[in-house]
């Protein structure tokens, strides 16, 4: 073999080895990955972090995927609260991190405090050692029975959240003492990765919704496919808007990007409402007059909070939903509603007078689109236009509820708006012909005139359906009108 051919062969072998190494991905230490020898692989970065929880340093090491790395939230430290390192070589996160030590001017410990500081850790270490020995022996006995780890018990051994606290406690603590934008990211990730999925409860254009369990509590897990990353990121961003939390808006818990090496799942964890969507509820149930008013008032309350701007250092921007429909509203145990599915929502910055519209090709549901959206005359530079479109959609939802209201034993069967005018899956052209050209609206049955509550609801619907968006009611006006009706009907909403 000539020297030239030998050199070419060596170069080829080197390139093959380099390609194989790149294909294998970056290997990192992962403290949560005991099933894979505490190792994970990623195309992003290795991640190590330490945070202060109940006065103790809690360390976590894992992989950060490319979407998480691009989001620029995992590689930033917070003074005296968290210290985070991201690196890009194999096992580079196998390092020891510590938070900054207290200042020299801190008061010295007395003899009693010093005794406690020394004694308590020694006792805890002894207990931990005994528990570790016992756990190892017990694991050897039970491993043959099942390979499925009880992640809810594992959380008690390694967790970034306080033992014995419920999700409501954690969310209340974060809302009361933090920025009001939800749980810390590390806590969200810990919760999401220790949820046990139970059964699938729904499917949509985004993916699937599962019923899950976390430490004995029910949660809902909305699982997006990787191709819907924009929808997942946008919805998580909107839900974590400061001061958004409200009893009539779906309670957000956590968001996480779960990558098992072959495919990626994008999780959105929220409160679980076993009665399902308003669409499902109305298909199954007939409602009383008081029940109708109670449902309608809770929807108006949630939408009014969403539309309202709260001014201040911990303020909230005005938000428009853009996809209000009965399938995007959930019914709680107390028979009130919570508005959900904020993936298409827009935010308004009143200071800069700008509208934050998501970069998402999907639009709202055609059947519920306002006339100005159907005929493309909506002024997208004015935020009020989006709020007015929401009001039109709410009027259609109220029509669905009112049809299921029993008055004198008479009740209509459940139907979608415009069920008798367009096909089951109408196009924009078909909806535009009915709503804009023919100026038709859902029919209000004559028997509604015999009931004051239904007469009021019918008037609200008509004032929500005006072709001129500026003439429609505001969410706050709808809320006040139905509140007065609620007092008359003694619905105790």
UniProtKB/Swiss-Prot annotation:
* Tissue expression as described in the entry: Expressed in interdigital regions in developing limb buds.
Cytoplasmic topological domain ranges are 135-493
Record's signal peptide: 1-25
Mode of membrane association: Single-pass type I membrane protein
List where the protein spans the membrane.
114-134
Residue ranges of every copy of the GS domain listed in the record: 165-194
Q: Does the keyword Membrane apply?
A: yes
One molecular function GO term is: nodal binding
What reaction does this enzyme carry out catalytically? L-threonyl-[receptor-protein] + ATP = O-phospho-L-threonyl-[receptor-protein] + ADP + H(+); L-seryl-[receptor-protein] + ATP = O-phospho-L-seryl-[receptor-protein] + ADP + H(+)
Which controlled-vocabulary keywords does the entry list?
A: Apoptosis, ATP-binding, Cell membrane, Kinase, Magnesium, Manganese, Membrane, Metal-binding, Nucleotide-binding, Receptor, Serine/threonine-protein kinase, Signal, Transferase, Transmembrane, Transmembrane helix
Residue ranges in the Extracellular topological domain are: 27-113
Q: Which CDD domains match?
A: STKc_TGFbR1_ACVR1b_ACVR1c, TFP_LU_ECD_ALK7
Give cofactor(s), names only.
Answer: Mg(2+); Mn(2+)
The processes (GO biological process) annotated in the record are: apoptotic nuclear changes; apoptotic signaling pathway; cell differentiation; insulin secretion; lipid storage; negative regulation of chorionic trophoblast cell proliferation; negative regulation of insulin secretion; negative regulation of trophoblast cell migration
Q: What is its main location?
A: membrane
Query: What subcellular compartments does it reside in?
Result: Cell membrane
Conditions for induction:
Upon oxidized low-density lipoprotein stimulation in macrophages.
Q: Which GO terms describe its cellular component?
A: activin receptor complex; cell surface; plasma membrane
State the phenotype upon gene disruption.
Acvr1c mutant embryos develop normally, with none of the known NODAL-related phenotypes found in these mice, suggesting that Acvr1c is not an obligatory component of the NODAL signaling pathway, at least during early development. Acvr1c deleted mice however develop age-dependent metabolic syndromes, including progressive hyperinsulinemia, reduced insulin sensitivity, liver steatosis, impaired glucose tolerance and pancreatic island enlargement.
- UniProt-listed Enzyme Commission number(s): 2.7.11.30
Metal-binding recorded as keyword: yes
Binding of ATP occurs at 201-209, 222
Tell me the subunit arrangement: Binds the type 2 receptor protein ACVR2A.
User: What is stated as this protein's family in its record?
Assistant: Belongs to the protein kinase superfamily. TKL Ser/Thr protein kinase family. TGFB receptor subfamily.
**How is this protein named in the record?**
Activin receptor type-1C
What species was this sequence derived from?
Mus musculus (Mouse)
Gene name for this UniProt entry: Acvr1c
């Amino acid at each position: 073999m000539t020297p030239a051919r030998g050199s070419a062969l060596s170069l080829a072998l080197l390139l093959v080895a380099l390609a194989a190494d790149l294909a294998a991905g970056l290997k990192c230490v992962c403290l949560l990955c005991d099933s894979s020898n505490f190792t994970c692989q990623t195309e992003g970065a290795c991640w190590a972090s330490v945070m202060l929880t109940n006065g103790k340093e809690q360390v976590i090491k894992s992989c950060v995927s490319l979407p998480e790395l691009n989001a620029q939230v995992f590689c930033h430290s917070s003074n005296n609260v968290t210290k985070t390192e991201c690196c890009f070589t194999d096992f580079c996160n196998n390092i020891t991190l510590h938070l900054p030590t207290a200042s020299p001017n801190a008061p010295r410990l007395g003899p009693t405090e010093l005794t406690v500081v020394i004694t308590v850790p020694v006792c805890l270490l002894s207990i931990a050692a005994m528990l570790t020995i016992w756990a190892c022996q017990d694991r050897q006995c039970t491993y043959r029975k099942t390979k499925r780890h009880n992640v809810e018990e594992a959380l008690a051994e390694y967790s970034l959240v306080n033992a014995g606290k419920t999700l409501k406690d954690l969310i209340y603590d974060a809302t009361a003492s933090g920025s009001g934008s939800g749980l810390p990211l590390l806590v969200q990730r810990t919760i999401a990765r220790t949820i046990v999925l139970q059964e699938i409860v729904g499917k949509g254009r985004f993916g699937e919704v599962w019923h899950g369990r976390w430490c004995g509590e029910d949660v809902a897990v909305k699982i997006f496919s990787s191709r819907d990353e924009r929808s997942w990121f946008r919805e998580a961003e909107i839900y974590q808007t400061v001061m958004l939390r409200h009893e009539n808006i779906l309670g957000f818990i956590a968001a996480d990007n779960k990558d098992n090496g072959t495919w990626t799942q994008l999780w959105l964890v929220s409160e679980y409402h076993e009665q399902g969507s308003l669409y499902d509820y109305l298909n199954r149930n007939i409602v009383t007059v008081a029940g109708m008013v109670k449902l309608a008032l809770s929807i108006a309350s949630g939408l009014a909070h969403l539309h309202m701007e709260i001014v201040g250092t911990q303020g909230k921007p005005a938000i428009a939903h853009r996809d209000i429909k009965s399938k995007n509203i959930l019914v709680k145990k107390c028979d009130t509603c919570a508005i959900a599915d904020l993936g298409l929502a827009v935010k308004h910055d009143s200071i800069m007078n700008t509208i934050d519209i998501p970069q998402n090709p999907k639009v709202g549901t055609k059947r519920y689109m306002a006339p100005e959206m159907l005929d493309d005359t909506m002024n997208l530079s004015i935020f009020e236009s989006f709020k007015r479109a929401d009001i039109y959609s709410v009027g259609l939802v109220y029509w669905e509820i009112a049809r299921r209201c029993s008055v004198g034993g008479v009740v209509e069967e459940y139907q979608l708006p415009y069920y008798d005018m367009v096909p089951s899956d109408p196009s924009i052209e078909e909806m535009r012909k009915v709503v804009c050209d023919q100026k038709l609206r859902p029919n209000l049955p004559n028997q509604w005139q015999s009931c004051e509550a239904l007469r009021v609801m019918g008037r609200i619907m008509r004032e929500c359906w005006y072709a001129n968006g500026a003439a429609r009611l505001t969410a706050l006006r709808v809320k006040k009108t139905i509140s007065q009706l609620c007092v008359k009907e003694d619905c105790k909403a």
